[in-house]
């Protein structure tokens, strides 16, 4: 069973955000792909850190012509710290927008209202590989038992990363 507590990110409602994050096991913080990281998002992130809650940042409105996913991602890294690492990233294919799963290195695009597998654009390959390596390193940093054993980690990383990400976000009752 999953319960979702929706709290507005406006600074005026910080009390409601505090109550929601306190009651929840984890926090999903939304930032606009058009306007970036808001003060409310920063406050929510800081509170989730203070309360030792798992955090997920979603960059919305990436389908807007004026959105800049990577600008907002870099802003998030500067403000919230280097552990901000994307798992899903958008890409443009003509007038369509697709998404790349950094973990599985699989791209999807919506055609006629249905998501279908697509090829990762050549222009995105290096960036996706860099993000995959950063994601692996950040996930490995959460594992006190194995983080120093890089040989073990690289031999087991395909399954380990998925399992560790699930554990950190869903199973780790802090």
Annotate each language-model stretch with its function.
Residues 14-35, 46-47:
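Inter-motif core of Ras-like GTPase G domains
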Residues 2-13:
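Switch II (G3) loop of P-loop NTPases
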Residues 32-174:
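P-loop NTPase catalytic nucleotide-binding module
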Residues 1-3, 25-26, 54:
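Loop/turn-to-beta-strand initiation segments
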